[in-house]
Amino acid sequence: MARKSEIVKAAVGIDYSKFEEPGGRFDYERMMREAVPHSLEEIVKIQSGMSVGDTKLLSLDNVTELARRTAGGGKGAQILVKDEAQNLSGSFKARRAALSVYEAHRMGYKGVVAATSGNYGAAVACMAARLGLKCIVVQECYDSRRVGQPEILEKQRACEAMGAEVVQLTVGPELFYETLMLLEDTGFYNASLYTPSAIAGIETLGWEIAQQCRSQLGRDPDVVVATNAGGGNITGTARGLRKAGAKSQVYAASVDLSGLHMASDHDFNRKSFTTGHTGFGVPFTVQPDRTDVPRNAARPLRYMDRYLLVKEGEVFYMTEALAALEGMERGPAGNTSLAAAFALSMTLPSDQVIVVQETEYTGAGKHPMAQLSFARRNGVEVLIGDPETEVPGKNIVLPDHPSRFKVRE
């Protein structure tokens, strides 16, 4: 760990020290300009060449109608969703992976290493396969009983299917240590979630939202809702919106897992989401430089206008509603922002527009039934009622009526 700075410098090709300033500050905008040698237009071209981006912006007419009927009184903002599941690896993470892996290839690295238990690993494996690079994905997967979460095991399957080597670890601090060891031993590129390239790759998402809203609706969205964990999603999306000249409000959304500790062996398998929750969202929002690079390019507090919280049960409910009402079966974690948008819609006038900026693919381990069954096996009750009574790690409360959805901050 004492050699972290030199290992990371060799593994990403960035000298972070030149962006430091007196008093513990650093020049964020200079870092983003100089560490990403591509314009937004060039990034769009790079991603397009890797079958990433230009995903559809879909109007959720039936979900919107449900919000309007439930709210009444002229409330119920129109809800649209950016169907990022259309990307080659099945999520918006393909955008950040495409640019990161492209940079690794451009700089002559023979392979890439990514520390992630989520969709990013599959995205890096996918892009590495397209560019002929080796890939190692490091997952925090098991508790001390060697019991792994179904969602993470699903990602193992996806990564290995695309030729990646998957290193699986138990919960705890060894993830970053093992990643540093692998970077040093292999000389591979650190395809971190938090490099400037990884964040710049998401800017195309915000830019597309603005362009597509103008084309389809003749206006910018009033609100864009982004699921928040490490902060890259909202940072990149907001930067892209700004580059498109949009003045939309940008809201973060996370699943409320208050009381659970993400490094706790006991708590690890008592949560249903590996990302997009407060266990990552809150710490990385207030202290972003707790990552595998010296300075995190994801700075959510610079860009979020509000931080909304949803309950686990609400996300599962909305996942089922999206499939039943719109014919879109998508992964639960990607519907965190949709659950927040549904609650928000019922508080806004019907002439306003909310864009949910992602969906993700679903699979056997990511499906709600797999996750709810796993929760029950780990002592978590699955109930139907008022989500306000939900206690993370003890129960999951599915709403008994759509009016139960609430805006929380």
Predicted segment positions?
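Buried hydrophobic positions in well-ordered alpha/beta secondary-structure cores of metabolic enzymes
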Residues: K56, V81, K93, G118, ...
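Active-site/ligand-binding loops adjacent to catalytic centers
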Residues: D54, F176-E184, K243-E329, Q371-E409
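A short, small-residue-rich loop immediately preceding and capping a beta-strand
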Residues: A104-M127, L131-C141, D220-G236, A333, ...
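Positively charged, low-complexity intrinsically disordered leader regions
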Residues: I7-K110
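Claisen-condensing/thiolase-fold acyl-transfer catalytic domains that form or cleave C-C bonds
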Residues: N228-R239, K243, E312-L383
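Active-site nucleophile and cofactor-binding loops and adjacent substrate-binding regions
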Residues: A85-A94, G111-Y120, Y194-I199, V224-G230, ...
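Acidic-glycine-rich active-site phosphate/pyrophosphate-binding loop
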Residues: L58-I79, S91-R95, L99, Y177-E184, ...
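Small/polar-residue-rich loop-to-helix segments that shape phosphate-bearing ligand pockets
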Residues: I136-D220, D256, M262-L309
